[in-house]
């Protein structure tokens, strides 16, 4: 399945409204294509704050996609993340690993793997931790499967919500017994969606990103939650959480390299 682009240039952002109808209508039989023209004509709805985003890169986009999250991480370091999914059809757990190949990931060649083995993640030349793109790619693929909609449609909603300059809130979290300062971004990309009636169960879906320079890779936690009845997030219908677990220096060096240091003891994020 072809990966999508997660970062807009200024020209792409400015042209979205004009292009949205043709992009969505190109997929015959798409569940949301019938309303694509109306969404584009309304600038993705005046009620949606994401539609009024500046052509400039928003701080939230810069934090998630344009920051060098892997700076300072040595080659052959493995970053481990726990993934937990709750809700129908079943509760699932997984481990996602990011292996740093080049120092600071300068070559953009970090490798991502999960229970199924190596995962191709669209790098797009972005300096960010690829686990962010891994999580978002999985999320929109799941939305497509659950709703019968189009991946590109859901991806655009998430991008617009981040482009709307959502608040970046300072938070303090407990990571393996230590207080860690972090930055939190929360978005709900499907609120006021003109096509929301077609996937009403997911209108209130919430995305939370927690970033911290206190951990290697800077991704402390990413979570999505589909609220229960009456917008109840205390008892979500579905949730998926990716949380940082630690960093490990591999004992198998790259060809021509010396054996790296022993395991790096780093704080683990509490879920």
List each model region and its residues:
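Intrinsic-disorder/low-complexity peptide segments enriched for small residues
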Residues: 2, 22-23, 61, 97
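Acidic/proline-rich low-complexity IDRs
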Residues: 3, 7, 23-24, 172
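Surface-exposed, glycine/proline- and aromatic-rich loop segments on solvent-exposed faces
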Residues: 111-142
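Sec/Tat signal peptide C-region and signal peptidase I cleavage site
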Residues: 29-33
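Bacterial N-terminal signal peptides that target proteins for export
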Residues: 2-18
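Bacterial N-terminal signal peptides
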Residues: 16-27
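Acidic, serine/threonine-rich low-complexity disordered tracts
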Residues: 38-123, 149-271
């Amino acid at each position: 399945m072809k990966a999508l682009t997660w970062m807009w240039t200024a020209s792409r952002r400015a042209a979205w409204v004009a292009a949205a109808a043709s992009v969505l209508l190109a997929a015959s039989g798409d569940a949301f294509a019938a309303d694509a023209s109306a969404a584009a004509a309304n600038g993705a709805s005046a009620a949606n704050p994401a539609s009024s985003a500046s052509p400039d890169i928003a701080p939230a986009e810069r934090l998630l996609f344009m920051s060098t999250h892997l700076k300072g991480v040595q080659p052959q370091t493995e970053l481990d993340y726990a993934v937990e999914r709750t809700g129908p059809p079943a509760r699932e757990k997984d481990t996602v690993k990011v292996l740093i190949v080049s120092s600071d990931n300068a070559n953009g060649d970090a490798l991502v793997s999960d229970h199924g083995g190596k995962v191709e993640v669209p790098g797009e030349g972005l300096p960010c931790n690829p686990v962010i793109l891994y999580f978002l790619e999985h999320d929109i693929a799941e939305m497509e499967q659950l709703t019968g909609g189009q991946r590109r449609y859901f991806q655009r909603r998430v991008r617009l919500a981040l482009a709307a300059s959502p608040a970046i809130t300072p938070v303090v979290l407990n990571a393996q017994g230590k207080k860690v300062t972090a930055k939190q971004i929360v978005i709900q990309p499907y609120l006021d969606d003109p096509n929301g009636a077609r996937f009403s169960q997911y209108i209130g879906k919430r995305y939370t990103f927690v970033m911290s320079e206190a951990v290697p890779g800077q991704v402390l936690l990413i979570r999505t939650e589909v609220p229960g009845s009456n917008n109840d997030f205390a008892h979500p219908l579905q949730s998926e959480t990716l949380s940082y677990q630690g960093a490990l220096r591999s004992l198998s060096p790259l060809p021509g390299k010396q054996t790296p240091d022993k395991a790096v003891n780093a704080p683990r994020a509490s879920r």
